[in-house]
Each structure stands twice: as C-alpha cells, then as structure tokens.
Amino acid sequence: YALPSYVDRRDYPLPDVAHVKHLSASQKALKEKEKASWSNLSMDEKVELYRIQFKESFAEMNRGTNEWKTVVGTAMLFIGFTALIVIWEKRYVYGPIPHTFDPDWVAKQTKKMLDMKVNPIQGFAAKWDYEKQEWKK
C-alpha cells in the first residue's frame, strides 16, 4: 500500500494528487470558476489552473539538464589523473628500453631470420626474394 504522491514524469503523466495541496483564497475562487464554461476563462487563468494541478509542463520535463558537463568534467579529471600516474611510472618505475628495440638490432635480427629461412612456406621468408635480396612485391 502506498500513499498517493505527486511526481512529474513523462511515463506517468497523471499523478495521483495535485501539485498544490493547500489552495489560497484566489486559487479556491479560480477552482470554482473552473466548474463553469472554460471559454469564460482567460489564458492566464487556464495556466494558473494548470500550475495548480501540475508543477511542470511536458516541455519543461523534456528540457535538457547540464548534468553532462559534470559527467564529462569528472571523466576528464580521472583521465588526467591516470595520465599523471602513467607519466610518473614511465619516469620512476620502468627501466630503460631494452636494446632489442634498437633499429640496428631489429635489422640484424631480421637478417638472421632471413638467413635461417624462417617459415618459408607462408611466413616471414616466403615474402623475401633471395635472388634480388629485397622484399617481394
């Protein structure tokens, strides 16, 4: 069992109770005037009656919020903090780059693999032309 409550939601367009629970004297008079023909009501009175029943219109409910700015800002804060940690790790935690990453070493290693004819059917050596001493085109 739940008590009737007011909520502005698009998927629940007609809340259980009115937005304004305690009417002022002018609002009570307007509610009495509402019982007659609506053509006698002015546009301002119709809006006032709407605001007694509902807090927001559908256009106001659908209006975007600025929450995305907070989400993007928080994400950027965490990304920046992570970048600082990575920079600190590269500088103080990791050692120097191994000599096997040196371009001369890679060239020597490639030459040795070609001399040994590594994987000659479909792999590395299959893409090398041994007569012209260059990569196949």
Swiss-Prot record:
Residues bearing PTM N6-succinyllysine: K28
CDD domains: Cyt_c_Oxidase_IV (cd00922)
Gene Ontology cellular component terms for the protein in this record: mitochondrial inner membrane; respiratory chain complex IV
N6-acetyllysine: modified positions: K21, K28, K35
Topology class, membrane: Single-pass membrane protein
Residues modified as Phosphoserine: S24, S26
Cross-referenced InterPro entries: Cyt_c_oxidase_su4, Cyt_c_oxidase_su4_fam, Cyt_c_oxidase_su4_sf
Keywords, sorted A to Z: Acetylation, Membrane, Mitochondrion, Mitochondrion inner membrane, Phosphoprotein, Transmembrane, Transmembrane helix
Pathway the protein contributes to: Energy metabolism; oxidative phosphorylation
Compartment(s): Mitochondrion inner membrane
GO biological process assignments: mitochondrial electron transport, cytochrome c to oxygen
Topology, Mitochondrial intermembrane side: 93-137
Positions of transmembrane segments: 67-92
Side Mitochondrial matrix, residues: 1-66
Keyword Transmembrane helix recorded: yes
Gene3D superfamilies documented for this protein: Cytochrome c oxidase subunit IV (1.10.442.10)
Role according to the record: Component of the cytochrome c oxidase, the last enzyme in the mitochondrial electron transport chain which drives oxidative phosphorylation. The respiratory chain contains 3 multisubunit complexes succinate dehydrogenase (complex II, CII), ubiquinol-cytochrome c oxidoreductase (cytochrome b-c1 complex, complex III, CIII) and cytochrome c oxidase (complex IV, CIV), that cooperate to transfer electrons derived from NADH and succinate to molecular oxygen, creating an electrochemical gradient over the inner membrane that drives transmembrane transport and the ATP synthase.
Similarity comment: Belongs to the cytochrome c oxidase IV family.
Complex and partners: Component of the cytochrome c oxidase (complex IV, CIV), a multisubunit enzyme composed of 14 subunits. The complex is composed of a catalytic core of 3 subunits MT-CO1, MT-CO2 and MT-CO3, encoded in the mitochondrial DNA, and 11 supernumerary subunits COX4I, COX5A, COX5B, COX6A, COX6B, COX6C, COX7A, COX7B, COX7C, COX8 and NDUFA4, which are encoded in the nuclear genome.
Protein name, per record: Cytochrome c oxidase subunit 4 isoform 1, mitochondrial
Protein source organism: Perodicticus potto edwarsi
